[in-house]
């Protein structure tokens, strides 16, 4: 299977559960899923969607959301899911860049955002047609999904993932985790992230198993969902593990239940958190590493006794550690992580310069620093960029700084990540006012509230007469990071 269309053809021949709604228990077997997706493909075609178009989605986790993602790809278009926490400004930027043929969203959700300058034709998430033409199937190298990632330049970039990218990574992960028709994944992460789309949906479908789609993660309901739906695994981020640790003990019968293991990634897991979780619940947590540009996962720990906690596991595809001249470094040496393989993206949508910078000599430059130990396990050391990872959400300081600098009273702005016991990192902004202007935390937070998603907003603001600079006038963030790292 090399395309989403072929995956659905395969599942359309079986009567085993494929997708399950966590709240209602509604279950779609393979034949029903294939039929529902075909009905959504017809609705997209009737709305004018053609091969090569984009289909934007602003839909919460649901069977409808998962079906529409599959339908857009099956129609030969690229699905473009939108972060539900974005503001109208952020959504407008995506719509202007992606130029989707349709936006699949409920009217009330779009109205809640406010005016959108680039809103295309709206299509209801309930749109399904029982009859009508179906388009030719897509090719493996057609773009199936465009995921917008926070950009280091201050604007989100669309990573183009092909059918081959998605299916090869899904199959590789399923094989590595030894998933089969009896396995079931509980999907509580949002379906606008690669983790939920790939690990939470495509991996179980490609293995012949099923996915339970929950509207969102709620720590207080997690173990009850495990008891009700009997999943064998679930994807998490470290913040979710911390929230589960903060809940009262579940009944003994629910403490592990059907779970073989949990999967985690998106941010490093503190060793103390990992050990505390496994001791309390008796569920192994399998760490991995990846990024949107490599579809989902590039490494995973083994699921047996060879796993190495505090590492990100071993490569699933070719991975190197290189120096600044692209020379391979020996085991134990720290350098940039670069990747190659069928999981590496096609490129950034309409951004050839950004694509060329990220893809050099056939290798994806991740911007992350790491080392491979003598046994081939990857250890993340830091980030070459200044990326902040807040509860699994990527936040780039440049975007926040540009928003802050647009405030009429702000002369200088610098954003760094500050340690946080729940989210891993949060945003801390350092500001210098314009001459004669007054700045206070409340007015700056109000400014950010209408311009940035909640996870991007600073949780602490420090106003200084001037920000630290070097001899050439370059802003120095090291002293600010030191301040952020020592806060109580």
PLM regions with names:
Residues 15, 131-148, 155, 178-184:
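Conserved pre-ATP/AMP-binding loop-to-beta segment of ANL
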Residues 42-47, 70, 74-137, 435-437:
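Structural core segment of the AMP-binding/adenylate-forming
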Residues 86, 341, 346-347, 354-357, ...:
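AMP-binding/adenylate-forming catalytic core of the ANL superfamily
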Residues 231-236, 245-307, 318, 325:
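Gly/Ser/Thr-rich phosphate-binding loop
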Residues 289, 308, 320-338, 372-375, ...:
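Conserved beta-loop-beta connector loops within the AMP-binding
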